A protein has these predicted regions:
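Helix-loop-strand module that forms the ligand-binding subsite of alpha/beta enzymes
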Residues: 1-68
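Glycine-rich phosphate/pyrophosphate-binding loop and the adjoining helix
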Residues: 70-135
C-alpha cells in the first residue's frame, strides 16, 4: 500500500540525540504531499524520556507539512527492558491503555467522518486503512 492509499498513519520512532531520527525526517521530506491532511498517531520510545522530546519535534514538523498529529500517543520508556528472552515486545498495561486510547480516538474521528460523508453523499464510508511506519 502506498502512502497516499492510507486514511491515517502511525509513526513508530526512537529518540535520536534528543530529536527525531534522520530516516523519519527524510521520509517526511520525500513523500509529505501524499500524507497531507491525514491524521498521524505517534509511538515513541527511548530510555528515561520515553522518546517524548523526539515526538514533540516530530509533531511540530508534521503540522508544518500539513499532516495532522493526534494528541493521543504511546510513549515507551526503557525500551530494552520491554522485551522478553525471546525478544518479543512485552507492553506494560500503560502502553496498552495508551495504544487503545490512540485507536479509540481515531475510531471516533472515523465515525464522525462517516456521519459527515453519509450526510453529504448519502453513502456509507469505506473501511479505513492505517499503516505503521517504523523508523
Amino acid at each position: 500500500m502506498g502512502a497516499n492509499a492510507a486514511d491515517a498513519y502511525v509513526f513508530v520512532t526512537p529518540q535520536y540525540n534528543f530529536g527525531p531520527p534522520p530516516s523519519f525526517l527524510n521520509a517526511l521530506n520525500y513523500v509529505y504531499k501524499e500524507w497531507n491532511y491525514k491524521p498521524a498517531g505517534m509511538v515513541s520510545y527511548g530510555r528515561v524520556s520515553e522518546g517524548v522530546r523526539s515526538a514533540l519535534v516530530e509533531k511540530l514538523t508534521l503540522t508544518t507539512l500539513k499532516i495532522m498529529p493526534m494528541v493521543e500517543a504511546v510513549a515507551i520508556p526503557n525500551i530494552s527492558a520491554q522485551f522478553d528472552d525471546m525478544e518479543n515486545f512485552m507492553p506494560d498495561d500503560h502502553h496498552v491503555r495508551s495504544g487503545n486510547a490512540l485507536l479509540t480516538e481515531r475510531a471516533l474521528q472515523i465515525g464522525r467522518s462517516a456521519e459527515n460523508d453519509a450526510a453529504i453523499n448519502s453513502t456509507t464510508a469505506n473501511t479505513y486503512r492505517i499503516p505503521y511506519f517504523y523508523f
